[in-house]
Amino acid sequence: MSLMNLPEESRPREKLLALGPKSLTDAELLAIFLRTGTQGMNAIELADKLLKEFGSLRKLLSSDENEFCSHKGLGTAKFAQLQAVVEMTERYLFEKIEKEDALTSPEHTKRYLTRMLRDRHREAFYVLFLDNQHRVLKGEILFEGTIDVAAVYPREVVKRSIDYNAAAIILAHNHPSGVAEPSQADRRITKRISDAVELVDIRVLDHFVIGDGEIVSFAERGWI
């Protein structure tokens, strides 16, 4: 059945405008993005099918171009649209932490770092560079590695911190395994980076480890 043949209150776009986006299911939100279905399937039915094939909305959003376009009803144009939506989301979250003290708004910082790192298939090491009032100057992935390790060089963290005239930094990296518990190697590299940046009067304020649905803070553990 075409969406136009559904009662108005059941059409995703009309429902969103009347009740707000939180009232919609994942399939209804995706249907608005898709706009049209395929032969024999309306946009909601196609969205529901795609969510089952990918396993979740998050997996669909984090899929690469080859995986995304291998599904019927999706193509490069839709992939480009999706990447634009994802990038706008990341920029929106960055703007929120950029305008605030990263320590007095830890939930915004955690949300941003989770969005940036959680769904990466390889380990990535991210640094937030802060000024002397702990406002964000820049955020950057400095190192990327394999599925379970990224080589991290303290001297490069020092160099980039000086480049951005940072007074403090927040470290973060993901565990593609999904388990956020820091390893002994994580603790050692944090200590090495802390020691290195302290030589140029820069402080490490925290190190977040991002897992699947969990985030561990070194500062909250008393390790920094």
Swiss-Prot record:
GO BP terms: proteolysis
Q: Which UniProt keywords apply?
A: Hydrolase, Metal-binding, Metalloprotease, Protease, Zinc
Q: Which domain of life is it from?
A: Bacteria
Residues that bind Zn(2+): 173, 175, 186
Q: InterPro entries from the xrefs?
A: MPN, RadC_JAB, RuvA_2-like, UPF0758, UPF0758_CS, UPF0758_N
The molecular function GO annotations come to: metal ion binding; metallopeptidase activity
Sorted alphabetically, which Gene3D superfamilies does this protein's record hold?
Cytidine Deaminase, domain 2
MPN domain: residues covered: 102-224
Kindly list the residue ranges recorded as spanning the membrane.
none
Motif JAMM motif, which positions? 173-186
Q: Which PANTHER family match?
A: DNA REPAIR PROTEIN RADC, UPF0758 PROTEIN YEES-RELATED
Identify its protein family. Answer: Belongs to the UPF0758 family.
Q: Which NCBIfam families match?
A: PRK00024.1 (NF000642), radc (TIGR00608)
Q: What is this protein called?
A: UPF0758 protein VF_0126
